[in-house]
C-alpha cells in the first residue's frame, strides 16, 4: 500500500524523517519496500511566467522564450514544446537543478546558436506522467507568483512509503489503520477526520426497504439526488494519484478515497439505471448467491458467466454487481448521472474470497473484504463519504436503509497474564544494560496505545477488550503477547538461552519408534515418499474442505494407496524404472457420527529393480509375490514381530487370489497384495506390482511394550537339531498359515522352525487337493534331543493335522 506522508501527518502528528519512520514501521512488521521521495523530483524547479515567445532563428520547431522566475532579470530559455506561448504560467527547472526522473542536470547551453538558461518542464519530465504532449501550463486563477517552488502545486512536496503488511492485519489496508499504528509506535497525537450527520428526515416512497440479505452480511443503501458529475478537485486527484489509483470522476474518486482512508469499500450505483434494470421505480436491492449460468458485465467491460460460488448484488433479482469485488457496467455512474445509490456493506471474508476466485478477479475492494472489514466503522465511513459527496458533487440525501444479518461480534475480551508474557518473551535490556522483566505499567502502556482496554482482575492478570478494528487478528492471549513484543521492539529484548532440564530434547517413544520404522524400511530398499493430504473429491466418505484453494484439492485422502499408485505410474512413465517406496501419513474419513483420522503406513514395489541384466541376456526378472511378501516380513523381523497372512478380497484394487490381510497377535494390521491386473493394464504398469497399507497405531501399540523397549539377546543353541519331514494331501481350501499355526502350537517349545519346501498339484493327487511337504526342526538350547523326546511330539503334530484338517499323511 502506498502511503502519502503528508496525508498521514494530517491524521497523526509525527515529525520523524521518512527514513526513521520507515525503519520503525519495518521493525513493527510493516515492511517498507520503497521510500519515494518526491521532493527531490522538483528540487530547484520554480514557477515561471512566459513574458515573450519568439521563433528560433535557426530552427523551425524551437521557440526562444523570455521567462520571469523571480530573479532580477528574466531568463532566456529555448523550448521545443508546441504549446508554449506568451502569458502562461509554467514550471521552470533553473540552472544547477537536477531532474532525477530523466537524469538531467541543468546547466547553461546553446541550442542551435541561442543560449538557454533553464528548461520549461512537462509533467513527464517531473515524473508525474509517463508521457506528455507538451509543457505543463498552470491555471491562470491559481494565484501563482514567479519564483515560488512548484513542489506543493504538483504534489511534489510529499514522500510516499510503499509498505506491505501481513495477511492477518486487515486494518493495515487503510490510512487510518497505519496512522493508529504510528500513534502506537511514536506516542504521537491521533486526529481522525470529523464526520457530520446527514439529514435523513426526508423519505421517499420510491425506495422500498426490501432486502434479501445473505446470512453474514450487512448492507446499507443511501439515496442521493441532484448530484453533478465532474472532475474531482485537484487535492483529491493528487491523493489518489499518489496512492496509484486512476481518477475517474468526483463520485467514483470519493468512494476510492474512502477505500484508502478507512479501508471500507463503497460502491456508487446510478439509481435510475438500477430502476431500469429492475423494471420498477419501487427498487428492491438484494444480496444472494449467483445462479449457474447467470451473466454480468462488470466495470472492466468483461462479460462474465457467474458460478454458484459468486455473491451478487441484485436489483429486482437481476445481478448488478459482484458483491465485494466489482460493480456492473450497466449501472455505473456516468456523466449523465444525477441520482445515486451509495452502497456500504460488510460481507463474510470467505464468501468474497470464493466469489473473486470463481471469476479469477481480485480487486482492491476484494482484498480488503477477504482480510476482514471493520463492521463497526462502516457507518462512520459511509457518513464520511456522504459528507464529501455533498461537498464536492452536491445533491441531497433522500433516505438511507440498513439491512443486516451479521452475527459477527467485533469486540471480545482476552485474559492476559504478566507471568506468561515474561515466560515467553524473556527479559528486556534496561538503560543500565541490566536485564529485567517487563512490568505491568509497560504492558498497559503498550496495549492501550493500540486501542485495547485493560481491566485488572487479579494480581498481574488483565481482562483485555480488543478494539473492533483489531478483532480479526487479536483472538488469543498469545496474539496480545506478540503485540507486546512487537511494540516494545524485538531488538530491545535481552539475549538469553532457555534453561535446559535433564529431560529436554528427548524423543517421545512414539516418535522414536516411527524413526526406527523409517530406518528399517530404507534398509530393505524402500524410498520414503510424501504426498499431499489434499486430493480430488470423489467419495461420500471423504472429508471436504469448507474453503478449498482449488477444486482438484478440495478433499482429504481416504488412504495412502492411491497416492502410491500414482507415484509408481509417474516414475514409470518418466522412464525412472519401478518405484520401491513407502509413506507414513494420515488419512481422514467421515461417518454418520462424525469425522475421523488415523495414521497409516503404506508401501509399493514391483517390476525388476535389479542391475546387471546383461547377465540374463537383457531379460527382466520381476519380483514375484513371495519375494514382495518377504520384504514385508523382513521389516517385521527386524522388530522381532511375526505377522500372519490370511486371504482377503475386500479391496477391488488388489488381485482377488493374491491378496492377504495382515494380523499381529490377533489384531488386524492391514492388507498386502498384488495390484489387480486390469488396474495395472489400464495404467500401463508392469504386470506384477505389490502394495500394502498398515494401521500404524496398531503396529506402534505392539512395539510400545515393556518387553520390547530393551532388546534382549537370545543365545544360539550349541546343540544339534533333529529334522523331520512331514508330507500329506490336504484340501485346497486350507491355507498354509492355518497349517503352520497348528504345527507350531502342537510342536511346543521343542519345535524351533517350520518350513514349507514343496507343493504339488497334478497327477496322482486327489481332486481338489494338493500335496504339501514341511520340514520341522526340533532343537533344545541345553541338550541334544533324543528320539524318545522328538517322536512323541512329532506324532502329536501329525495326529492334530489329521483330526483338524483331515489330511492324508504321506510320510
Curated annotation (Swiss-Prot):
Residues 39-151 form the tRNA-binding domain. Residues 409-495 form the B5 domain. It catalyses: tRNA(Phe) + L-phenylalanine + ATP = L-phenylalanyl-tRNA(Phe) + AMP + diphosphate + H(+). Residues 717-810 form the FDX-ACB domain. GO terms for biological process: phenylalanyl-tRNA aminoacylation. Mg(2+) binds at residues 473, 479, 482-483. The keyword Ligase applies. Its cofactor is Mg(2+). Its main location: cytoplasm. Keywords: Aminoacyl-tRNA synthetase, ATP-binding, Cytoplasm, Ligase, Magnesium, Metal-binding, Nucleotide-binding, Protein biosynthesis, RNA-binding, tRNA-binding. This is Phenylalanine--tRNA ligase beta subunit. Tetramer of two alpha and two beta subunits. It comes from Synechococcus sp. (strain ATCC 27144 / PCC 6301 / SAUG 1402/1) (Anacystis nidulans). Its EC number is 6.1.1.20. Gene3D superfamilies: 3.30.56.10, Bira Bifunctional Protein, Domain 2, Ferrodoxin-fold anticodon-binding domain, Nucleic acid-binding proteins, Phenylalanyl-trna Synthetase, Chain B, domain 3. Belongs to the phenylalanyl-tRNA synthetase beta subunit family. Type 1 subfamily. PANTHER family: PHENYLALANINE--TRNA LIGASE BETA SUBUNIT, PHENYLALANYL-TRNA SYNTHETASE BETA CHAIN AND LEUCINE-RICH REPEAT-CONTAINING PROTEIN 47. Pfam families: B3_4, B5, FDX-ACB, tRNA_bind, tRNA_synthFbeta. InterPro entries: aa-tRNA-synth_II/BPL/LPL, B3/B4_tRNA-bd, DNA-bd_dom_put_sf, Fdx_antiC-bd, Fdx_antiC-bd_sf, NA-bd_OB-fold, Phe-tRNA-ligase_IIc_bsu, Phe-tRNA-ligase_IIc_bsu_bact. Binds 2 magnesium ions per tetramer.
Amino acid at each position: 500500500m502506498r502511503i502519502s506522508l503528508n496525508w498521514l501527518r494530517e491524521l497523526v502528528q509525527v515529525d520523524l524523517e521518512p527514513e526513521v519512520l520507515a525503519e520503525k514501521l519495518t521493525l513493527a512488521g510493516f515492511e517498507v519496500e520503497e521510500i519515494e521521495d518526491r521532493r527531490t523530483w522538483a528540487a530547484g524547479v520554480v514557477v515561471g511566467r512566459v513574458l515573450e515567445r519568439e521563433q528560433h532563428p535557426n530552427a523551425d520547431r524551437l521557440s526562444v522564450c523570455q521567462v520571469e522566475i523571480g530573479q532580477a532579470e528574466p531568463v532566456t530559455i529555448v523550448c521545443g514544446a508546441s504549446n508554449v506561448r506568451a502569458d502562461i504560467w509554467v514550471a521552470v527547472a533553473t540552472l544547477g537543478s537536477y531532474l532525477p526522473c530523466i537524469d538531467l542536470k541543468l546547466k547553461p547551453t546553446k541550442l542551435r546558436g541561442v543560449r538557454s538558461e533553464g528548461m520549461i518542464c512537462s509533467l513527464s519530465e517531473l515524473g508525474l506522467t509517463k508521457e506528455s504532449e507538451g509543457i505543463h501550463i498552470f491555471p491562470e486563477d491559481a494565484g501563482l507568483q514567479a519564483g515560488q517552488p512548484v513542489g506543493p502545486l504538483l504534489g511534489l512536496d510529499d514522500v510516499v512509503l510503499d509498505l506491505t503488511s501481513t495477511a492477518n492485519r486487515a486494518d493495515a489496508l487503510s490510512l487510518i489503520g497505519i496512522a493508529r499504528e504510528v500513534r502506537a509506535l511514536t506516542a504521537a497525537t491521533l486526529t481522525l477526520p470529523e464526520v457530520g450527520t446527514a439529514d435523513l428526515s426526508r423519505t421517499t416512497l420510491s425506495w422500498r426497504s426490501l432486502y434479501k440479505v445473505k446470512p453474514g452480511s450487512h448492507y446499507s443503501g443511501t439515496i442521493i439526488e441532484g448530484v453533478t458529475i465532474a472532475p474531482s478537485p485537484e487535492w483529491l486527484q493528487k491523493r489518489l494519484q499518489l496512492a496509484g489509483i486512476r481518477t475517474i470522476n468526483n463520485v467514483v474518486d470519493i468512494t476510492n478515497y474512502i477505500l484508502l482512508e478507512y479501508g471500507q469499500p463503497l460502491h456508487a450505483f446510478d439509481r435510475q439505471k438500477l430502476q431500469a434494470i429492475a423494471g420498477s421505480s419501487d427498487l428492491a436491492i438484494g444480496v444472494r448467491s449467483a445462479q449457474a449460468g447467470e451473466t454480468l458485465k462488470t466495470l472492466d467491460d468483461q462479460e462474465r458467466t457467474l458460478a454458484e460460488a459468486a455473491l451478487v448484488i441484485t436489483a429486482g433479482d437481476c445481478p448488478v454487481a459482484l458483491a465485494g469485488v466489482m460493480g456492473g457496467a450497466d449501472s455505473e455512474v456516468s456523466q449523465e448521472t444525477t441520482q445515486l445509490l451509495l452502497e456500504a456493506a460488510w460481507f463474510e471474508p470467505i464468501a468474497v474470497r470464493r466469489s473473486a476466485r470463481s471469476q479469477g478477479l481480485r480487486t482492491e475492494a476484494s482484498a480488503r473484504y477477504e482480510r476482514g472489514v471493520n463492521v463497526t466503522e462502516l457507518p462512520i465511513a459511509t457518513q464520511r463519504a456522504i459528507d464529501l459527496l455533498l461537498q464536492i458533487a452536491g445533491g441531497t440525501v433522500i433516505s438511507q436503509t440498513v439491512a443486516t444479518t451479521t452475527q459477527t461480534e467485533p469486540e471480545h475480551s482476552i485474559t492476559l497474564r504478566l507471568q506468561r508474557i515474561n515466560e515467553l518473551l524473556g527479559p528486556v535490556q534496561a538503560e543500565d544494560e541490566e536485564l529485567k522483566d517487563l512490568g505491568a505499567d509497560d504492558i498497559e502502556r503498550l496495549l492501550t496505545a493500540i486501542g485495547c482496554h485493560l481491566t485488572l482482575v487479579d494480581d498481574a492478570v488483565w481482562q483485555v477488550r480488543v478494539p473492533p478494528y483489531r478483532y480479526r487478528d487479536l483472538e488469543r492471549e498469545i496474539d496480545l503477547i506478540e503485540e507486546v513484543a512487537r511494540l516494545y521492539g524485538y531488538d530491545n529484548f535481552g539475549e538469553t538461552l532457555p534453561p535446559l532440564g535433564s529431560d529436554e530434547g528427548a524423543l517421545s517413544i512414539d516418535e522414536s519408534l516411527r524413526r526406527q520404522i523409517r530406518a528399517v524400511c530404507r534398509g530393505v530398499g524402500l524410498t520414503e515418499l510424501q504426498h499431499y493430504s489434499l486430493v480430488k473429491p470423489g467419495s461420500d466418505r471423504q472429508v471436504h474442505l469448507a474453503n478449498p484453494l482449488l477444486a482438484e484439492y478440495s478433499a482429504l485422502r481416504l488412504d495412502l494407496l492411491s497416492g502410491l499408485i500414482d507415484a509408481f505410474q509417474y516414475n514409470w512413465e518418466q522412464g525412472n524404472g519401478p518405484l520401491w517406496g513407502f509413506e507414513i501419513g494420515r488419512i481422514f474419513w467421515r461417518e454418520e457420527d462424525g469425522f475421523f483420522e488415523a495414521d497409516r503406513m503404506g508401501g509399493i514395489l514391483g517390476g525388476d529393480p535389479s542391475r546387471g541384466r546383461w547377465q540374463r541376456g537383457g531379460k527382466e526378472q520381476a519380483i514375484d509375490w513371495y519375494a514382495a511378501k518377504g520384504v514385508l516380513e523382513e521389516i517385521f523381523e527386524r522388530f522381532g514381530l511375526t505377522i500372519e497372512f490370511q486371504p482377503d478380497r475386500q479391496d477391488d484394487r488388489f488381485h482377488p487370489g493374491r491378496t492377504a490381510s495382515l494380523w499381529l497377535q490377533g489384531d488386524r494390521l492391514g492388507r498386502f497384495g498384488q495390484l489387480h491386473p486390469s488396474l495395472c493394464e489400464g495404467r500401463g504398469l508392469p504386470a506384477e506390482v505389490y502394495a500394502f497399507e498398515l494401521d500404524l497405531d496398531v503396529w506402534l501399540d505392539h512395539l510400545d511394550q515393556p518387553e520390547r523397549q530393551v532388546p534382549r539377546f537370545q543365545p544360539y543353541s550349541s546343540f544339534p537339531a533333529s529334522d523331520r519331514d512331514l508330507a500329506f494331501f490336504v484340501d485346497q481350501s486350507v491355507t498354509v498359515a492355518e497349517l503352520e499355526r497348528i504345527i507350531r502350537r502342537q510342536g511346543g517349545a521343542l519345535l524351533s522352525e517350520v518350513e514349507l519346501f514343496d507343493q504339488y498339484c497334478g497327477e496322482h493327487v486327489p481332486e481338489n487337493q494338493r500335496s504339501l511337504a514341511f520340514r520341522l526342526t526340533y532343537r533344545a538350547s541345553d541338550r541334544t534331543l533324543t528320539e524318545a523326546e522328538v517322536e512323541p511330539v512329532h506324532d502329536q503334530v501329525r495326529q492334530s493335522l489329521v483330526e483338524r484338517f483331515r489330511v492324508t499323511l504321506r510320510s
